[in-house]
UniProtKB/Swiss-Prot annotation:
One of its GO terms (cellular component) is nucleus. Gene3D superfamilies: LysM domain (3.10.350.10). Residues 114-157 form the LysM domain. It is found in: Nucleus. The lineage of its organism: Eukaryota, Metazoa, Chordata, Craniata, Vertebrata. The modification Phosphothreonine is found at T134. Residues 162-183 have a biased composition (Low complexity). Residues 1-46, 161-188, 324-416 are annotated as: Disordered. It comes from Homo sapiens. Pfam families: LysM (PF01476), TLD (PF07534). This is Nuclear receptor coactivator 7. The modification N-acetylmethionine is found at M1. Keywords: Acetylation, Activator, Coiled coil, Nucleus, Phosphoprotein, Transcription, Transcription regulation.
């Protein structure tokens, strides 16, 4: 027994050992926590805890070695964060809640919003309508990933009581995370704020409304003004909206044709799935002409539009041409950025940047130094490049010049830029201008000494620049180099720029830029100048210059643009005449003068130097343009001054391009009723499925980009590439040169009669005996074989071949409309109504649905009326409306519109009426409008 007890004491059980290990582990954890809290790093505390239990010393020592390593690594981190914990660790509970919050995305309510809980019946559209906001805005406001919401979901909606009327989706928008820690100001108090942000800021998902993900990467719809070429009903202006799913056209309600015929005739909508081909052309040579053979088509058809220099690729290669299109657009942008470059690749400084520098009075320099500068400028005018540094100091002269430059160049930057270096050709002229400015800004006594040399230098430079261009072969450049003042004294205009169009367009540009100026005075100046001669212009200029006022309202200021560049930049003006809008690069730029002395010095020098030399060259070739402008001004002066401003139509001189949309079936009328929109595909079968629109040329690239992005397989595809030939008419058409193309068509669609004719090569007539009449069960009391045969031919294909079963007959079931409804309730197929009146006339209708009681019209476009009085006629759906079938307790109606019914029967199936209705455009089916029913049958197909 003793041995057994000793064994028990010596050998402990498994659970006892496990319990001791667990207890030792807990003691080690508490010891490490105490060591971390005190930061002493001593081991005595841990050993004291472990002394009572001597059996577990080895196990605890293993734990302690691991804890020492962990403690050393943690102490380094804790020492770094000791300073930070003063600001963040308030208590343990708050830290625990912070740890939980770090795992969640904290959403702050935006300004001007309130919370709304979605109900069972709420949808995103209904909530948006309730709070006067668009659904897309609501999705953006709540950062939703779908338009689907669930009951109980909390959404942010605009608050009507909030003072902020607009919702600002900024950094405080929903989705922007808010850190649960302290503010940024507390971060700045720390010795290392960046370290604090990196160390303690939780890892969170930041959703900002200004991020690139929120911005739409592609255009989701296009909206533009265009004109629709209708089929024989004129051309209507309207708005086209193109989306990835639909193409819509809404006519302008103010269009004369819309006022006359209504908007129902011109509103169109077409799903993108029904579009066969979309193409853009420069003309309408591809437009189909009615009753024209293929050989009559023009041979020089306009090629398909491609942006830039894109070659007309094959259809299988241009499925996704994004890369090349982007590269072409990039080249276009580079070309637009280099429009200030001339044909000979010499840079031209824009006017504002060159004239915006203010001439100042140089301090510390004498008159001799300025005259030396002027002499050196004459020496370097034709040769080496010069470096000029223009001053920015203000002066009285510069203030007036700045205002003129800013008004003439409204679209450019107003900042003044120092011109550090220019090219060789441009630098000479610029240096001469700067030197001339410095000389003119001298004191009066200094100016008198320099006037003679200024006159000589100006005359010499003007004569040299003008005579240098006399030898050129280009007349346009020659006339651009001529002096403007001399041409004005001779009452002559320079050559019209090729890029500016007609003289009318240049005058329109003048009036457009100077909208804030006195336009009446401008036009009076033009007219009086042409009548009284050049002396008027001299007097006007002298008075304006002597007064020191701004000379723009009078139209006297000579404002210059870049030059005769091939880039076609818009020309700024303000000259005495509308065509004087540019000079050659070699000429000195104009200077705004404030005194009559300065004006006379320059003016007399220019006039005397070039008046005799350039008289004939300016006068000969420009009289036509002057007379055109005179006539145009005389016509425009008769209208109010508001009408002188150019309209949008006048500004856009480029012709439109033409958009051709080919569809598989005619487009639906967007303003038609819902039922008509569903069944409109059955009507107007003879209408060609091709629609033409005139679109603005500036929106053509947008259209092309949109189609290539959303429907790349549609643009430019021809219908024949798909292997189908759209048959638009029911009868056969003669196809010119059908057999000239060997084996290009694998199959064709023909009528039943043509197939029968081809069965026998020697048959020249149709064998009508081969037609098998449908089986009628039971035999009809009203229809004979002749009636059945003719009706069977006109029935839709989906019911041909089925036996006819009698569903209702007045001879069997009695004369009651309710009985007819009851017998037709079990049917699930189209029905044929046959009526025989007291005049023994047989007529009726084919209905796509069984007759039933309904509170609205039903049926499809396959419904038709027929009569055998006196000959067999079928009246199909006209497409005007969708009043096919309407079943009521008191009557049964087929066709309607305008209070007239194609066929009407009373509740007793005894009295009836037939009128011409707009649904079928039918004749009266019976001999008289009102008739009495003798017998009636309803046949089903099953």
């Amino acid at each position: 027994m003793d041995t057994k007890e000793e064994k028990k004491e010596r050998k402990q059980s498994y659970f006892a050992r496990l319990k001791k290990k667990k207890q030792a582990k807990q003691n080690a954890e508490t010891a490490s926590a105490v060591a971390t809290r005190t930061h002493t790093g001593k081991e005595d505390n841990n050993t004291v805890v472990l002394e009572p239990d001597k059996c577990n010393i080895a196990v605890e020592e293993e734990y302690m070695t691991d804890e020492k390593k962990k403690r050393k690594s943690n102490q380094l981190k804790e020492i770094r964060r000791t300073e930070l914990k003063r600001y963040y660790s308030i208590d343990d509970n708050q830290n625990k809640t912070h740890d939980k919050k770090e795992k969640k995305m904290v959403v702050q309510k935006p300004h001007g919003t309130m919370e709304y809980t979605a109900g069972n019946q709420d949808t995103l559209n209904s909530i948006a309508l309730k709070f006067n906001i668009t659904p897309n805005k609501l999705v953006e406001l709540n950062k939703l990933f779908t338009h689907t919401i669930v009951p109980g979901q909390v959404l942010f909606v605009p608050d009507a009581n909030s003072p902020s009327s607009t919702l600002r989706l900024s950094s405080s928008s929903p989705g922007a995370t808010v850190s649960p820690s302290s503010s940024d100001a507390e971060y700045d108090k720390l010795p290392d704020a960046d370290l604090a942000r990196k160390a303690l800021k939780p890892i969170e998902r930041v959703l900002s409304s200004t991020s690139e993900e929120d911005e739409p990467g592609v255009v989701k719809f296009l909206k533009m003004n265009c004109r629709y070429f209708t089929d024989g009903k004129g051309v209507v202006g309207g708005v086209m909206i193109v989306t990835p799913n639909n193409i819509m056209f809404d006519p302008h309600k103010s269009d004369p044709l819309v006022i006359e015929n209504g908007c129902e005739e011109y509103g169109l909508i077409c799903p993108m799935e029904e579009v066969v081909s979309i193409a853009l052309y420069n003309d309408i040579s591809h437009m189909k002409i009615k009753d024209a053979l293929p050989s009559d088509l023009p041979q020089d058809l306009c090629p398909l539009y491609r942006p830039g220099e894109w070659e007309d690729l094959a259809s299988e290669k241009d499925i996704n041409p994004f890369s090349k299109f982007k590269s072409i657009n990039k080249e276009k942008r580079q070309q637009n950025g280099e429009k200030i470059m001339t044909s000979d690749s010499r840079p031209i400084v824009p006017l504002e940047k060159s004239t915006g520098h203010t001439p100042t009075k140089p301090s510390g320099s004498s008159v001799s130094e300025k005259l030396k500068k002027l002499d050196s400028s004459r020496e370097t005018s034709h040769g080496s490049p010069t470096v000029t540094k223009l001053s920015k100091e203000p002066s009285d002269t510069s203030s007036a010049f700045e205002s003129t430059a800013k008004e003439n160049f409204l679209g450019e930057d107003d900042d003044f830029v120092d011109l550090e270096e220019l090219s060789s050709q441009t630098g000479g002229g610029m240096h001469k201008k700067d030197t001339l400015k410095e000389c003119l800004s001298l004191d009066p006594e200094e100016r008198k000494k320099a006037e003679s040399q200024i006159n000589n230098s100006a005359v010499e430079m003007q004569v040299q620049s003008a005579l240098a261009f006399l030898g050129t072969e280009n007349d346009v450049e020659l006339k651009g180099a001529l002096d403007l003042e001399t041409c004005e004294k001779q009452d002559i205009m320079p050559e019209v720029d090729k890029q500016s169009g007609s003289p009318e367009s240049r005058v329109e540009n003048t009036l457009n830029i100077h909208e804030d100026l006195d336009k009446v005075k401008l036009i009076e100046y033009y007219l009086t100048k042409n009548k009284e001669g050049p002396q008027v212009s001299e007097n006007l200029q002298k008075t304006e210059l002597s007064d020191g006022k701004s000379i723009e309202p009078g139209g006297i200021d000579i404002t210059l643009s870049s030059s005769l560049s091939q880039a076609g930049d818009p020309i700024t003006e303000g000259n005495k005449e509308p065509d004087k809008t540019w000079v050659k690069k070699g000429e000195p730029l104009p200077v705004k003068l404030n005194s009559s002395t300065e004006a006379n010095v320059i003016k007399e020098a220019l006039d005397s130097s070039l008046e005799s030399t350039l008289d004939n060259s300016c006068q000969g070739a420009q009289m036509d343009n002057k007379s055109e402008v005179q006539l145009w001004l005389l016509k425009r002066i008769q209208v109010p001054i508001e009408d002188i401003l150019p309209s949008k139509e006048e500004k856009s001189k480029t012709p439109p391009m033409f958009l051709c949309i080919k569809v598989g079936k005619p487009m639906r009328k967007s303003f038609a009723t819902h039922t008509a929109a569903m069944v409109q595909q059955y009507g107007k079968r003879r209408k060609q499925p091709e629609y033409w629109f005139a679109v603005p040329r500036e929106r053509v690239d947008h259209l092309y980009t949109f189609f290539v992005q959303w429907s790349p397989d549609v643009y430019g595809k021809d219908a024949k590439e798909q292997g189908f030939v759209v048959v638009e008419k029911e009868e056969l058409n003669m196809i010119d040169n059908f057999f000239s193309e060997p084996t290009t068509k694998s199959w064709e669609i023909i009528t039943v009669e043509e197939a029968k004719r081809r069965k026998s090569t020697c048959s020249y007539y149709e064998d009508e005996d081969e037609e098998v009449l449908p089986v009628l069960r039971p035999h009809s009391a009203l229809l004979e074989n002749m009636h059945i045969e003719q009706l069977a031919r006109r029935l839709p294909a989906r019911v041909q071949g089925y036996p006819w079963r009698l569903a209702y007959s007045t001879l069997e079931h009695g004369t009651s409309l309710k009985t007819l409804y009851r017998k037709s309730a079990s049917l699930d197929s189209p029905v044929l109504l046959v009526i025989k009146d007291m005049d023994n006339q047989i007529f009726g209708a084919y209905a796509t649905h069984p007759f039933k009681f309904s509170d609205h019209y039903y049926g499809t476009g396959e419904t038709f009326l027929y009569t055998f009085s006196p000959h067999f006629k079928v009246f199909k759906w006209s497409g005007e409306n969708s009043y096919f079938i309407n079943g009521d307790i008191s009557s049964l109606e087929l066709g309607g519109g305008g209070g007239r019914f194609g066929l009407w029967l009373d509740a007793d199936l005894y009295h009836g009426r037939s009128n011409s209705c707009s649904t079928f455009n039918n004749d009266i089916l019976s001999k008289k409008e009102d008739f009495i029913v003798q017998d009636l049958e309803v046949w089903a197909f099953d």
